[in-house]
Amino acid sequence: MKSYRIYLLFLLLAAFSLYGCKKTDSGSGDFDVQFAVPESVTISGDAGTFKFRVLFGKSPLSTDKVIFGDPSGQLNTCDIVSVSSSEFTVSLYKGMVSGQYNVYIRRGNLKKLVGKMKVTIDHSGGSTDIIVNPEAGSTVYGVVVCNGKRISNAVVSDGVEVVKTDENGIYQLKSGKKHKYVFISVPSGYEVMSEGILPKLHRQLVKAPAVPERVDFALQEAPGQDNHTMLVFGDIHLARRTGDQRQFRDFTNDVNDYVTANSGKKIYGITLGDMTWDLYWYSNSYALDDYLKDANAINGLQIFHTIGNHDHDMMYAGDFETVTKYKKIIAPTYYSFNIGKVHYVVLDDIECKNTGKGDADSRYYNESLVQEQIDWLSKDLAFVPKTSTVVVTMHAPLFKDNGNLSAGNGSSLVDMLKQYSQAHVFTGHTHKVYNVDKLASDNIFEHNAGAICATWWWTSYLTPGIHIGQDGAPGGYTIVNVDGDKFKWQFKATGKPVDFQFRTYDRNTMSFTAAKYVPDASDAYKNQFLLYASDYVTTSTSNEVYMNVWNYDPSWKIEVTENGNPLKVTPMRANDPLHLVSYTAKRLNKNAKPSFATRDTRHFFKVKASSPSTTLNIKVTDRFGNIYKEDMARPKEFSTDIYK
């Protein structure tokens, strides 16, 4: 269910008078006004107004009225105080209470029901009674409160400057308002209000750079954060194509099931970027707003967001203007927050070099942390004790899977993070799963955490029941359990139990011929298939078994026995055969380029058995002692059906 939590403290300064309530018994009728009525909203008890989103450009007239039919049956008529093509604002009536409301629009004697809305009135505290004056040179200022209590030492930033609230909960920023927003680094033990899945930790700035403006932040208490779970969501790539929205519902259902099963624990979520696909913002009319509609199927979960390269607007040249929509709709492109004993930092390591032509060929970017962001991070971390644990999320990887630095300016990030007791870096972008453990040398562990969409939603679209990435890892997410400063994590495949951690293949039963897998392809595409499938084109009598252990790191242990005798486990690089036949072959068979073709991976292993028909006992133990097993009866058939 959608849940909008709205804190409109700054609107209270506007001179909007509240319209009186009266019994309304108008006739019913129809006229062309359309707007979205959220299923559920939370409104501050101090809020004097509420905004509705206009649909299809069908705005009301300023003389129309909005009527709230309250739980007692009373019809309460409210003025419309401002209207645009995208939204309109109404004055809320005095004495509004929590409950289920029918929402009507009225024009003259015509009235029509638009929707039903559950309203929760939040009286957790406000700050409009606190007098705050800007200091000399301050252009953004305000107070941070919770339940009427002023919160000191809360960190606030405009993306350039970083300050803390004083003993009275007041902050003062000498801001140039470059990013046109201000955000709070949510302090430990607190949360901000939510609007659906979005934690509303930033506010838009509306006045000229030199004109002081007040922005307050209201927090709510969140006890028990020291023991919390963070669900980490890699690339999503919703674009209204390849059945992605239907498949995405499988993911949202999976997350809802997990949250329900662990209802006694503090759980949050965070994305790793590429929630959308910029090319299809325009060609398929699916953009950031549409993503939020689909993602709001997730219940009771605040989801922080990281920006990816495909969340930039390619219709603009350069970098700065490409993120304007993202900053207004989703979140700042970089910011921080605290949960329990962990300081979380969200970074943007995509530096766009767009030409602004608006086509795929004009889309250029560097995977790099620009210096301005490094400077901001240095200021942010100055308030974080070196004994703390820091978690960083960004879209493109910090390290390659061989451990070498990948991100531009990555050495600056490493130099800052290694000063802390430990740092975990979660990244996406590759649609692969791999880990880089540098805890011993630099106090850093990077998790390149795969993709919700796996192969951009293609494998399940072409081969229903198979949802895997180019490295054979399933589409899914990472469950990070935090107990104080102790971290444990597991990869969770969508729709699978959490103990599904590897897949096995019997090499003896695989023979990937062009005649079998790409019979309709041209000779050129058949030859391409044979290149991708070169390890599997001939029947083998080697008695080898391959294992794809996607979340493997060097602290894992893989043991295989045959008739009680241990077999030598050998690392290898290989193309995942299931991905070959469920995606690459099916594209080639249609004489189409496999844009997301199978890629070899480092998380493959093999053993050599003594016989083609013995059962192998496979035991995989992760770094935390969790054990995953398969008793592999052989010969094991290779077909997509057995892996569904």
Language-model segments: which ranges?
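N-terminal active-site segment of His-dependent metallophosphoesterases
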Residues: I131-T139, C146-N147, G189-Y282, K644
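Metal-dependent phosphoesterase/phosphodiesterase active-site architecture
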Residues: G126-D129, N133-V140, I197-V206, V211, ...
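Short, acidic Ser/Thr/Gly-rich low-complexity loop/linker segments typical of extracellular
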Residues: S157-S175
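Extended active-site neighborhood of metal-dependent phosphoesterases/phosphodiesterases
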Residues: S188-V211, Y280-V384, G408-H424, N435-D483, ...
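Short, ordered, surface-exposed loop/turn motifs in non-cytosolic proteins
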Residues: L61-T63, G137-V160
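A short, solvent-exposed loop/turn motif at the edges and junctions
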Residues: F88, N109-L110, D158, H179-L205
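Immunoglobulin-like IPT/TIG beta-sandwich domains and homologous Ig-like subdomains
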Residues: G29-L113, G159-E161
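Bacterial Sec-dependent N-terminal signal peptides
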Residues: L11, A15-T42, K112, K118-E135
